[in-house]
């Protein structure tokens, strides 16, 4: 949530195997991030009597854009915000953005951050509001709880640089990734650093949450700096080694 007294709230809709569609609500309006499928999202919005104002697309993969076209049939005035470099792969975008663009939506300022690595032209959305207790990051598949996205199109150098960009944000930034991978990521990290108290404590905490049917997310940048081995890798060589190890690792 953006600030203790804010009327902004963010809600998870769990879909498919491990995707999370985040819904950002302000008064009677909503913004949806990376809708994998339309059904559960449309149902949730209609039950809450919310008007869909925009859809934020971080990248072109079907488990992130699969529900968009059906949602804009129900709410034709909703903007579809996506990278202007992805017109071919996200052809239904109606509000095209580029790296470092800033636009306003639902009484907040949103900055676009280009984060190559998982895919070319992947973007993240950084949301700030004056006098808010914290700011918010929707990183798509770039940054996860305790992890980062696989390198499907980009290089280790690109992902390392993208994580460096995100790591430069304020430490109280709340992070809303598009997948629930935190437990697996922390188990992997613990296999490399079995004595890391921060990872041990975080893993215990999120396992309790998951057992209660809760989400492990959002996390904070402060928390990721203590427990995310990818984010704190000292150099590209270390990052590359970690990414290759994680790609081969079995939980």
Swiss-Prot record:
Top-rank EC class of the record's enzyme: hydrolase
Alphabetical keyword list: Hydrolase, Metal-binding, Zinc
Associated pathway: Secondary metabolite metabolism; methylglyoxal degradation; (R)-lactate from methylglyoxal: step 2/2
Gene Ontology biological process terms in this record: methylglyoxal catabolic process to D-lactate via S-lactoyl-glutathione
Gene Ontology MF terms in the entry: hydroxyacylglutathione hydrolase activity; metal ion binding
UniProt keyword annotation of rRNA-binding present: no
Cofactor: Zn(2+)
Domain of life: Bacteria
Binding site for Zn(2+) 2: 63-64, 141, 179
Protein EC: 3.1.2.6
Matching InterPro entries: Clx_II_MBL, Glyoxalase_II_hydrolase, HAGH_C, Hydroxyacylglutathione_Hdrlase, Metallo-B-lactamas, RibonucZ/Hydroxyglut_hydro
Task of the protein: Thiolesterase that catalyzes the hydrolysis of S-D-lactoyl-glutathione to form glutathione and D-lactic acid.
HAMAP family in the record: Glyoxalase_2 (MF_01374)
Listed name of the protein: Hydroxyacylglutathione hydrolase
């Amino acid at each position: 949530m953006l600030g203790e007294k804010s009327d902004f709230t963010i809600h998870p809709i769990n879909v498919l195997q491990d995707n999370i569609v985040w819904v950002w609500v302000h008064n009677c309006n909503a913004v949806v991030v990376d809708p994998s499928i339309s059904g559960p999202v449309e149902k949730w919005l209609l039950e809450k009597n919310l008007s869909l104002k925009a859809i934020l697309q971080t990248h072109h993969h079907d488990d992130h854009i699969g529900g968009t076209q059906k949602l804009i049939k129900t709410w034709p005035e909703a903007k579809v915000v996506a990278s202007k470099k992805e017109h071919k792969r996200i052809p239904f975008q109606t509000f095209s953005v580029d790296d470092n663009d800033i636009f306003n939506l639902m009484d907040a300022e949103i900055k676009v951050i280009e984060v190559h690595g998982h895919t070319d032209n992947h973007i993240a959305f950084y949301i700030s509001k004056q006098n808010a207790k914290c700011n918010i990051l929707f990183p798509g598949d770039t940054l996860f709880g305790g992890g980062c996205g696989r390198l499907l199109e980009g290089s280790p150098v690109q992902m390392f640089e993208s994580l460096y960009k995100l790591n430069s944000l304020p430490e109280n930034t709340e992070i809303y990734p598009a997948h629930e991978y935190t437990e697996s990521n922390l188990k992997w990290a613990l296999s490399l650093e079995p004595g890391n108290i921060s990872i041990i404590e975080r893993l215990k905490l999120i396992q309790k949450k998951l057992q209660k049917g809760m989400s492990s997310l959002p996390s904070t940048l402060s928390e990721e700096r203590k427990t995310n081995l990818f984010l704190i890798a000292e150099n590209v060589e270390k990052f590359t080694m970690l990414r290759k190890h994680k790609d081969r690792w079995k939980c």
